[in-house]
Structure formats: C-alpha cells, structure tokens
C-alpha cells in the first residue's frame, strides 16, 4: 500500500507526536508498505528553542520531505502552510499515487489532508492526538469549523482513549461512533531497565523524581516545582530532575529560583536526543506527570516500561492507562497540596513504590506494544482504502483574526 503520512511535528523536535510517528513508520515499513512522510518543522530560532527545530532526519525505508512552517513562524499564517502541504501531497501523488493519506493532528495537518483527499480522490485517516482535541477549535471560529469538518468528513478518525473521545465530542459536537480507539504504545525493550526484575537498581541517596517531556505549564511543570517546595518544607528528602524544552522553561527556572531551589536540588537538563532518553529514565525512581490533559501520554508509557512508579493526574488521556492506587497515584490537576501528598507517599513508602512500578510494568508489557497498535492502524487503512473521500463540505473557512494562536502558533 502507498501511504502518505503527514506529521505536525517530527524529530529533531521533541514531542509525543515525534515518538508516535517514528514507531508507526517503523511498523509500516516492516509490514512492506511504501511510505512517504511529509513533516512540518520550525526553522526559526524561537521555534527551535521551544520545541527543537530543523528538517526531519532520514527514516529507514521512508521517503522524507520537510516543509518549513514559514507562515506560522513569521505571522501565524496557518493558511499559507496548509496550502504548501496540500501542494506537496499533490506533487508526490502525481509522481506515484497514494492509497491512503494519514494526518497526525486535526489542524492544520488534518485539514490539509482533508483538502488533499478531496482534490486527489484518496481516502483520509486523521489521528487526534493532543491539543487538537483539547483546545484547537475553542480558540476561534476558523479553527472550530476546520476541526468540525475534519471530524465529520475524514474516512477514519483515530484517538487514544474513551476519555478523549468524550472530551472531543462534548467540546465540538462530534459523533462518538466516528472514532476508532487506538491506544498509545511503547517499545518496551528499548526502555527496559536491564535489571532482573525490570525495576530501578538499588542506589544510595534520596528517591529520584523525574519530569520529562515538554516543559509547559499545561503539563504541570510549575505545579511540580510548587509541590517540591512543600516536600522540602516538611523535610522529605528527594532528588528532582526536569528534562526537556518547551514554552515554559524560563518561567519554570524562575519559579525554582524564587522558591530558593539550587541548581543541584532541581536539575534542569534541557533538550534530550531521543536516543538518550531511555538512559534518563534509568537514572530515576519515580516519574511525575502532573498534566492537565493528554491525548495518550507517551512519556507515562515510557516510564511504565522503564519500571518507574508514576504520579500523575485524573486527566483526559491519563485515566485510560493509569488507575489510582493500582498502577499509579493520581490527583486532580492543579491541586498542589494533593500532588505534594502523593509525592510524599511514594517517596517514603518503598513497598508502595515497588508495587505500583511492578503493576505498571506488567500492564505495559502486556497491553501497549507497537506491534499490536501498528496492526490495528493498518487494519483501519485496509478498511477505508477503497472508500471515496468526502466532498460535501466547503473548502472555505470563516475568517476570525481574533484567534490567540495567531500570535502564539507554537502553542497550537
């Protein structure tokens, strides 16, 4: 099958979308499919600092095309970049026709694939993966209509869990029957500890708390720092690391300084090449993800695969894989005293920490394999490959210049 995969964000940008794309591409190539990936990327200094930027690297067995987000990074002009994506897909289709167009993220990439599918007569698949389900479309009428058209007219919609389906349908009025639930997945071998039981090796010193991913207040990084201040005040020993880049690196460092944390007390380690990420997990005992919402958290799955106990939140995209007291500890998003309480429990109770880590590791190995998820996605391709794309929608979107993402497109 000839597959076009259109990515909103791929390496060197560090994102759950990058990880998802890398693993799916590997599964598609391994199954013998002919795959082309077109990926957007930031080429400007600001975008590179926030997410990591530059053209996508080669991917074994995949034709890779990078498209710089010239519209977004200069003036928040999503429409310019959408037109560029549609033109690139059409050129590749003319060279060798596609059977499936698959977009990662509902807007702008999902809208671009919907337009290209209509133009070329090829069925479309769209993965709803994060902010596209949480806030894109609540920002302005332009993006609301675009998201609603994608959700109504793509040949197939993939989404990580039932809680995310509920949120998207409540917010945008979609039909839940339109969605196919495809959970997140992780390469369990790659993130394995290498110990006999799969858990972190014993070590001297305090329990090591680890935050990894986008450094973003929406991911709870500022709440984590505030909770650590409570732990310190009550005399609970810990070591803490915050790994990654994102829009709130500077505010996070400023808050840590304001709370009088030394650079040794909270280590900010910055950008991490994806190849080095498993070793970061191996230097921790507890993964902390006080997120407000996810599509399906790749980092939580990575932490489970690495045998770490997990502290997170009762949030969309988390509740589909973690259950409080069974394979993790969960608190309400934004409840800093409760977060501090959960961290205190997991730091001071060795048996609890081990029980949660063992349960998470066992479930991760049993449920969240990329081979199973890849087969499920390829099954969706087979189901829709002979369908006609929808044409009963307008290609013209209403103009709404009030959208907050015009000024801060990197947050979309």
Residues covered by each model-derived region:
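Short hydrophobic beta-strand element within catalytic cores of glycosyltransferases
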Residues: 309-312
């Amino acid at each position: 099958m000839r597959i076009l995969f259109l990515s909103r964000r791929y390496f060197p940008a560090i994102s759950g979308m990058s990880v998802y794309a890398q693993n799916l591409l590997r599964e598609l190539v391994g199954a013998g499919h002919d795959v082309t990936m077109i990926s957007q990327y930031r080429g400007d200094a600001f975008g590179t600092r926030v997410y990591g930027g530059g053209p996508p690297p080669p991917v074994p067995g995949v034709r890779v095309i990078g498209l710089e987000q010239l519209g977004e990074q200069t003036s928040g002009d999503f429409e310019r970049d959408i037109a560029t994506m549609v033109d690139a897909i059409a050129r590749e289709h003319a060279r060798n026709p596609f059977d499936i167009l698959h977009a990662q993220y509902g807007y702008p990439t999902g809208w671009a694939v919907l337009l290209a599918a209509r133009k070329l007569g090829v069925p479309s698949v769209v993965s709803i993966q994060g902010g596209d389900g949480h806030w894109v479309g609540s920002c302005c009428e332009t993006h609301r209509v675009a998201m609603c058209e994608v959700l109504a007219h793509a040949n197939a919609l993939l989404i990580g869990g039932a809680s995310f389906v509920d949120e998207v349908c409540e917010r945008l009025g979609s039909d839940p029957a339109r969605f196919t639930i495809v959970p997140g997945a992780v390469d369990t071998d790659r993130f394995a500890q290498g110990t006999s039981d799969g858990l972190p090796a014993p070590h001297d010193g305090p329990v090591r708390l680890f935050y990894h991913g986008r450094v973003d207040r929406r991911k709870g990084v500022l709440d984590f720092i505030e909770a650590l201040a409570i732990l310190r005040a009550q005399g609970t020993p810990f070591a803490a690391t915050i790994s990654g880049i994102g829009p709130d690196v500077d505010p996070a460092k400023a808050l840590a300084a304001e709370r009088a944390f030394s650079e040794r007390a909270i280590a900010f380690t910055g950008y991490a090449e994806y190849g080095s990420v498993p070793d970061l997990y191996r230097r921790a005992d507890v993964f902390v993800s006080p997120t407000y919402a996810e599509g399906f958290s790749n980092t939580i799955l990575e932490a489970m695969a690495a045998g770490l106990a997990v502290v997170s939140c009762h949030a969309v995209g988390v509740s589909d894989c973690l259950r409080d007291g069974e394979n993790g500890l969960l608190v309400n998003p934004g409840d800093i005293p409760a977060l501090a309480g959960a961290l205190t429990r997991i730091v001071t109770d060795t048996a609890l920490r081990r029980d949660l880590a063992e349960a998470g590791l066992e479930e991760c190995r049993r449920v969240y394999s990329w081979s199973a998820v890849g087969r499920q996605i390829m099954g969706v391709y087979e189901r829709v490959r002979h369908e006609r794309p929808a044409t009963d929608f307008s290609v013209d979107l209403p103009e709404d210049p009030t959208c907050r993402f015009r000024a801060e497109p990197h947050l979309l």
